[in-house]
Amino acid sequence: MRNFEIVIGIENHVELKTKSKMFSSAPVSYGETPNTNVNETDMAYPGSLPTINKKGIELAIRTCNALNMEIDTLVKFDRKNYFYPDLTKGYQITQQYNPIGKNGKLNINVNGLTKEVDIERLHMEEDTAKQIHKDDLTYIDYNRAGTGLVEIVTRPVLRSADEACAYVEKLREVLLFLKVSDVKMNEGSLRTDVNISIRPFGTQEFSNKVEVKNLNSISNIKKAIEFEVERQTKLMLNNEIIIQETRRFDDTTNSTVSMRSKSDALDYKYFREPNIMPIQLKKEWVEDCIKNSPELADIKRIKYVNDYKISINDANIILTSIEMTEFFEETIKFTNNYTKVANILISDIQAQLNNENTTIDKLALLPSHLAEMINLVDQSVISSKHTKTILPIIMKDSSKSVIEIVEELNIKMISDENEIANLVNPIIESNLELLEQYSERPERVTKTIMGQLMKVTGGNVNPEAGMNIIIKLVENKIK
C-alpha cells in the first residue's frame, strides 16, 4: 500500500427539504404508507406534465453559493433515458449538460491540516422510487419518486479514507445548517457513492476506478474505502487487472461485492427535456436566495469562540446538532452567561438526550427557563447544587417558571443580613472557645461557623453574604 497513491472522488445525492416534489405537487414526507404520496406526474400518466418546484431551485442556489460555485442562471433540464422498475416514466429529469453549479470548493480539516476539495458540479434532478427486497419478492414504493435532489460531484482529489469521511461530514454540516436537507444518511436523504482507484506514486494517469454505491454512514464509507484499497493493492501487486465496475458494501462482512461491470453501462441517450423550457433566473431573485441563506456553522463557530468565549470543543459539540444550536442561541437571548449555558447543554442535558434517544426540541424544556435558572444562580437566589434538582423538572414540565419551582421546593437562598445574623449568633454562642483561635487562624474559624450555618439551613444561605456576616459578628464578639 505504501507504493500506491489512493485516488478518490465522491458523488453525493441530497434530498431537498421541500414540501412537494421537484416536478409535481405530491407531498414529500418520509415514512408514510407506501404509494400514497404520489400523483399523476410521478406515475407518468399520459398527458401529465412537470411543473418546476421554485423552492428546489432556491435550495440548489443556496448550496452552490456555500460551496463557492459558479451559478448558471439559465436553468435547463435533460432526460436520462433508461428502463428500470423504479422509474415509471422510463426516463429521469436531470441536468446533464448545464448543471446549475460548477467549479466549487470546500475546505476540510484532517489531522489538524486544512485541505481544499475541488467540486466539479452540482446539478438538480428527481429521485427514483424505492425498492424493498423481501423474501423472493421485490416491492416498489413510489412515494420517493420525483423527490427533488441535488447531486454534488467532487473531482478525484481525495487521497485517503479519512479525507473522504471528513469531506462528507463537512458537506453534511453545510447542508444541515443551510436547511437544504435533513441529511439523515440512515433514511437515504444523503447518499454517498465513492469512486476509488490506486496508482503508483508519481504516475499521472488514472487507473481503472471502482464505484461503491449507496454508502449510508460515515463508518461504512471508511470501511468500504479501506477494504477496496486493500483489494485493489493485492490485485496490482499480483499483476492482475482491476476491473472497472460498480460494487456495493456489505456491512455484515465489511467487504465490497460486485454488482455490474462498467462495460455493461447503459447509453442513457441524454437529450433536452422537451416539457420544461429553459428558465432565465432574475439576478435580483438569485441575490435574495443567497442573502437569505441561514448562517453556516463555520461562522457560528468563530462567533462562539471569539465573542462568547466558549471552548472550541464545546462549540463543536453544540454545532453537531442544529436543534442544539438553535436552542443555545435562543437561550443566550435571556442570559449573558454563555459558557454556563454551553456547559449545561453538553453535559446534563446531552446526557438526558442520550438516555432517551431523542433531540432537545422534543423536551418540554424552554430556553427562557434554562436561562432563568442560570440567572438565579448568578444572582445568588439559588445555589449551583440546586440546578441538579430543578433541571429534571423543567425538562419535563414547562408550565411553571423556575422561581415558582424554587419557592415550592423552599430552596431559595437566604440573603437578608438580619435573617443570617439571627442564624449565626446562636452558632457563635455555642462555639466561644473557637473564637480564641481567630487571631491566629481566622479562616479556619469562619469556615467552621459557615459549615454549621450551611448545615442548619440545608445549604440555603448566600455564601458571600453569610461569610460577610460571620466575619462581622465574630470580630464584634472578640473586641
Swiss-Prot record:
Family (UniProt): Belongs to the GatB/GatE family. GatB subfamily.
Protein name: Aspartyl/glutamyl-tRNA(Asn/Gln) amidotransferase subunit B
Pfam families hit by this protein: GatB_N, GatB_Yqey
Function: Allows the formation of correctly charged Asn-tRNA(Asn) or Gln-tRNA(Gln) through the transamidation of misacylated Asp-tRNA(Asn) or Glu-tRNA(Gln) in organisms which lack either or both of asparaginyl-tRNA or glutaminyl-tRNA synthetases. The reaction takes place in the presence of glutamine and ATP through an activated phospho-Asp-tRNA(Asn) or phospho-Glu-tRNA(Gln).
Keyword list, A-Z: ATP-binding, Ligase, Nucleotide-binding, Protein biosynthesis
GO aspect biological process, one term: glutaminyl-tRNAGln biosynthesis via transamidation
Assembly description: Heterotrimer of A, B and C subunits.
Record-linked InterPro entries: Asn/Gln-tRNA_amidoTrfase_suB/E (IPR017959), Asn/Gln-tRNA_Trfase_suB/E_cat (IPR006075), Asn/Gln_amidotransferase (IPR018027), Asn/Gln_tRNA_amidoTrase-B-like (IPR003789), GatB (IPR004413), GatB_C_1 (IPR042114), GatB_Yqey_C_2 (IPR023168), Gln-tRNA_amidoTrfase_suB_CS (IPR017958)
Species of origin: Mesoplasma florum (strain ATCC 33453 / NBRC 100688 / NCTC 11704 / L1)
Gene Ontology molecular functions: asparaginyl-tRNA synthase (glutamine-hydrolyzing) activity; ATP binding; glutaminyl-tRNA synthase (glutamine-hydrolyzing) activity
Catalytic activity as recorded in UniProt: L-glutamyl-tRNA(Gln) + L-glutamine + ATP + H2O = L-glutaminyl-tRNA(Gln) + L-glutamate + ADP + phosphate + H(+); L-aspartyl-tRNA(Asn) + L-glutamine + ATP + H2O = L-asparaginyl-tRNA(Asn) + L-glutamate + ADP + phosphate + 2 H(+)
EC code: 6.3.5.-
Gene: gatB
